[in-house]
Amino acid sequence: MTTIKTSNLGFPRLGRKREWKKAIENYWAHKIDKAELDQTLTDLHKENLLLQKNYHLDSIPVGDFSLYDHILDTSLLFNIIPERFQGREVNDDLLFDIARGNKEHVASALIKWFNTNYHYIVPEWDNVEPKVEKNTLLERFKYAQSINVNAHPVIVGPITFVKLSKGGHQSFEEKVETLLPLYKEVLQSLVDAGAEYIQIDEPILVTDDSESYEDITRKAYDYFANEGLGKYLVIQTYFERVHLKFLSSLPVGGLGLDLVHDNGYNLKQIEDGDFDQSKALYAGIIDGRNVWAADIEAKKQLIETLQQHTQQLVIQPSSSLLHVPVSLDDETLDESIAEGLSFATEKLDELDALRRLFNDNDLSKYEHYKARYERFQSQSFKNLEYDFESVPTHRKSPFAKRKQLQNQRLNLPDLPTTTIGSFPQTREVRKFRADWKNNRITDAEYQEFLQNEIARWIKIQEDIGLDVLVHGEFERNDMVEFFGEKLQGFLVTKFGWVQSYGSRAVKPPVIYGDVKWTAPLTVKETVYAQSLTDKPVKGMLTGPVTILNWSFERVDVPRKVVQDQIALAIDEEVLALEEAGIKVIQVDEPALREGLPLRSEYHEQYLEDAVHSFKLATSSVHDETQIHTHMCYSQFGQIIHAIHDLDADVISIETSRSHGDLIQDFEDINYDLGIGLGVYDIHSPRIPTEEEITTAINRSLQQIDRSLFWVNPDCGLKTRKENEVKDALTVLVNAVKKKRQESESTTA
């Protein structure tokens, strides 16, 4: 058999303990200057490269490291600058302003990266002049060479980049053709600098409509081949299957395929002879998106199968390791569960174990991982019985009747205002929580602090004039991790951070066993907040679909079973809140859209399961109890009917970063439930104007019945500063008051 090689597609940017995040946020807060930021990030990039080198990879990616987002990096590389930000020097400060907005201009749209919890900044083509502005990819490649790292450059391919863009008068094909000479310039510079191959990521080729743009895809890669570059290119795909016969016909040196999340189709196509054996096969055999250790014996057998179909085999993760934490080294976990886990560095070590086995006949690492996996699998985490049938999955009455009863009970004004749930997690809040978790303060001291913060923010909300209040979620570090800490069947790590967007990091819990509610989770804080005001306070919960999508899910039982187990746990908490007198309960599902499979053949079942789980969690309450939900960052056209089927009394949806595009989705559906379309972007420090909020309200009311419409920010306010929150909410409430006055004067 031929020698196998190992490679990687991308590595986590955050650092073991979020050094990347802290440096960038310190720069934004003017606590460090640009020179210190650059040095910190250079050191971290070097650490990442050398860490990967320790695992004997034949080639290490460079270009995956970023100050914010690799798609935004590509936009700046080719001078695809939003019109409102043009005329400035292309530098890191411009990058941050495009991503976050500033006092003068709104940020660019933020969209989920395929069906992951990562988000990219959408490129904007309106009135742009594409050119190679600053070849940072070449700089990073040369840096890797300078520290003796055998690296391959990584760049998002032209088909994917343009397909993920918006705006401009050119057609999709015209935009691709515009970029081809610029890609050629960058690719040639990398080859001239010594790149043995270039990883060109085209994940868009795994989607349903990829066959509709095969002609322009072929034209693009024929162009590169005619320029003498084809043999240096490896087209990487991930997250799903591809049309392998077409992909194999492209004049490139290699193809990267996901052999984990392809439902077996990529392997079948290889076995059917659709892979061009003159090319290198970059086989994604180690799961790049989940944290479970590989069944290394099964991977050995897979490699043996693949070797029958290629003479150039490179094994790698199924996708960039951006989606998993850095390392288990700093964790102190129950060994019986830790043996079943694998973070980024452990995944690279699994690749090294397989490389040693096949190339050197060295069984030591292989046997180690095989024994660990077998010990973990010998345990049983399926111990509980569930009565799914006894819990209702439909509300007692139709929405019209519920709305009448809720109006009588809540007595809310026209265009009611609220927020999405969380308020600023200040340094003081985080310190008190950390001190409590580390037993540096007593339970009583921590509860006193929480109650003081809740009381302070209840008063702030009342002073501003909001109609439905929230307690602020100061006891929660994350909307999923919090529930993972309290529900049976979850494991929460200390340093298992992954990047969500920009400097925002989340720590997904690990679901390892049966999920069960054992005690109230949120009742104490919510009831205390309600005791301070006559206005309704929302109970704040995270929904079953989001908890599952934002956790590392177990793989030993079907996904639907885990989702419904979580739904039953949330149902218990919903009933506990209702019994405690809470009149409005929000069950957030911001991740419902992101979990939608990339292939439409799987959509119907996914959405059916998601709707069922949400209704399982929310249908036991009385008609008078108002159920809210919230979704964000998404393109909802494909799921608008499922959103309606949730039968939530009120749904709030992020629209600000889409600049109103979402409202068009309501033109084709008679949406007859309560709805709030977020009227300003909380991900930017910029304070909206009354005029902007009024414009957003007016546009929304063109499509939505006024009696159903709510006014709110687009997401929780956890990441904002206190003064930003107060100022923005004051503007929001003032704009609504003027709208109410207009209505009163019109009807007078």
UniProtKB/Swiss-Prot annotation:
EC number(s) per entry: 2.1.1.14
Active site: H683
Top-level taxon of the source organism: Bacteria
Binding-site positions, L-methionine: I420, G421, S422, E473, D588
GO process terms (BP): methionine biosynthetic process; methylation
Binding site for 5-methyltetrahydropteroyltri-L-glutamate: R18, E19, W20, K21, K112, W550, E594
Cofactor names: Zn(2+)
Pfam families: Meth_synt_1, Meth_synt_2
Cofactor note text: Binds 1 zinc ion per subunit.
Residue sites binding L-homocysteine per the record: I420, G421, S422, E473, D588
Annotated pathway: Amino-acid biosynthesis; L-methionine biosynthesis via de novo pathway; L-methionine from L-homocysteine (MetE route): step 1/1
Keyword terms of this UniProt record: Amino-acid biosynthesis, Metal-binding, Methionine biosynthesis, Methyltransferase, Repeat, Transferase, Zinc
Binding site for Zn(2+): H630, C632, E654, C715
UniProt keyword Transit peptide present: no
GO molecular function list: 5-methyltetrahydropteroyltriglutamate-homocysteine S-methyltransferase activity; zinc ion binding
Catalytic activity: 5-methyltetrahydropteroyltri-L-glutamate + L-homocysteine = tetrahydropteroyltri-L-glutamate + L-methionine
Record carries keyword Methyltransferase: yes
Similarity comment text for this entry: Belongs to the vitamin-B12 independent methionine synthase family.
Function per UniProt: Catalyzes the transfer of a methyl group from 5-methyltetrahydrofolate to homocysteine resulting in methionine formation.
Protein's UniProt name: 5-methyltetrahydropteroyltriglutamate--homocysteine methyltransferase
Lineage: Bacteria, Bacillati, Bacillota, Bacilli, Bacillales
